[in-house]
Swiss-Prot record:
Gene: STLP1
Name recorded for this polypeptide: Sialyltransferase-like protein 1
Protein family (similarity comment): Belongs to the glycosyltransferase 29 family.
Principal localisation: Golgi
Enzyme superclass (EC): transferase
InterPro entries registered for this protein in UniProt: Glyco_trans_29, GT29-like_sf
CDD domains: GT29
Origin species: Oryza sativa subsp. japonica (Rice)
Length: 393
């Protein structure tokens, strides 16, 4: 009875042994490396450039800015600012200097307790009362916020200058200035631009002592204006201040500073032409988009997924250089850039850069501006001959 079972059993054993012998080769084929795929063909440069230009022209901050301006025009503190900020307006009647006119601002009530940070006590939105002339000025400012590269050509007259300045030094705040001994060279220029109220006392040998224009962003002014004893002209009464607006509600800080008793005889604070703001924003965004595509290999449309596109902004230094390009016959730039052994700012202990700026993209723009300005997008439509620009390190 056992004999008939031997042959089927032998066949089954043979099949099992064959399967076991072939399993390693099957396994190697199943888990082996995937076939190498051919790389994607590079995007046509002209097509890529057109995409970058199109995306750089998009402004996701326009809608919220429009809402903030509407709030101010209707006498309300903008919702984007009311939650965490307040403006300590000095007195019941203030003046905002804008476009060479004075515009009164009225309000009811005040903050009698100066021991408390006014940022913790926002003004009730219904208490802000703007003069009709101020409403017209704000409306005009927002209406001018459009792309017009020709604004560079008109900067001397917009800034009430008698003509172009022979030579300008734009002094940044990088720690690379320490030990550079550029002070005398900086002061030898016809005009010296400084950024964001950077301190010069004690640093004159490296950063110079002369100041002809103070260029600041409105966040810096806001931090000063919220303090009861703020003096908005740290370089002296005779040094004009040119300010670009980061939030529409910061116009109230301009009013506060211009109306303070210590500023009555000082040079007024001027606001940058919004067309210049738009031009600077487009240039920097273009270079940021280009850097993103080159470094990641991803589509330019994905740039906004890595940044807060509505908050993305150029730096104060970048716009100061653009102003110099528009009003100076020769531009020298100091204190821009980084070094491993240098502080972020020569005058402070700030450790890191702000995320809303793309400094590497701005450095790429500076290289093109100095070496081949004809390739800078949007700038080549300004209708001006870009003056020589030299960066000192």
């Amino acid at each position: 009875m056992k004999r008939p079972l031997r042959r089927p059993f032998a066949v089954l054993l043979f099949v099992v042994l064959c399967a076991a012998a072939s399993f390693p080769s099957v396994l190697r084929r199943s888990v082996g490396p995937a076939p190498v795929l051919a790389p994607l063909p590079p995007l046509d440069p002209a097509r890529l450039n057109a995409t970058l230009l199109r995306l750089a022209a998009a402004d996701p901050s326009e809608a919220p800015l429009r809402r903030d301006v509407d709030d101010l025009l209707e006498g309300r503190l903008p919702a984007s600012s009311a939650r965490a900020r307040a403006w300590r307006l000095r007195g019941d009647r203030l003046h905002l200097h804008l476009r060479h006119h004075q515009f009164p601002v009225y309000r009811r009530g005040h903050h009698p307790d100066h021991d408390h940070d006014p940022l913790l006590h926002p003004l009730p939105r219904q208490e802000l009362h703007l003069d009709p002339s101020l409403r017209r000025a704000l409306r005009s400012w927002h209406r001018l916020r459009r792309h017009d590269p020709g604004v560079l050509r008109n900067l001397p007259s917009l800034l009430s200058l008698p003509g172009r300045i022979p030579s300008c030094a734009v002094v940044g705040n990088s720690g690379i200035l320490l030990g550079a001994s550029h002070g005398a060279l900086i002061d030898s220029h016809a005009a010296v631009f400084r950024l964001n109220n950077a301190r010069i006392s004690g640093f004159a040998a490296n950063v110079g002592a002369k100041t002809n224009l103070s260029f600041i962003n409105s966040n810096v002014l806001h931090l000063c204006a919220r303090r009861p004893n703020c003096f908005c002209h740290p370089y002296g009464d005779g040094v004009p201040i040119l300010l670009y607006i980061c939030q529409a509600a910061h116009f109230l800080d301009v009013a506060s500073c211009n109306a303070s008793s210590r500023s009555l005889h000082a040079a007024s604070i001027s606001v940058t032409d919004p067309r210049l703001d738009v031009l600077c924003a487009r240039i920097v965004k273009y270079y940021s988009l280009r850097r993103f595509v080159a470094e990641t290999g991803r589509a330019a449309e994905e740039w906004s997924s890595t940044r807060d596109a509505a908050m993305f902004h150029y730096s104060s230094g970048m716009q100061a250089i653009m102003v110099a390009v528009g009003v100076c016959d020769r531009v020298s730039v100091f204190g821009f850039g980084k070094a491993a052994d240098a502080k972020h700012h020569y005058h402070s202990n700030q450790k890191a850069e702000l995320d809303l700026h793309d400094y590497k993209a701005e450095y790429a723009f500076y290289r093109d501006l100095a070496d081949r300005p004809e390739v800078v997008p949007f700038l080549n439509d300004a209708g001006i001959a870009v003056p020589p620009v030299v960066f000192y390190h």
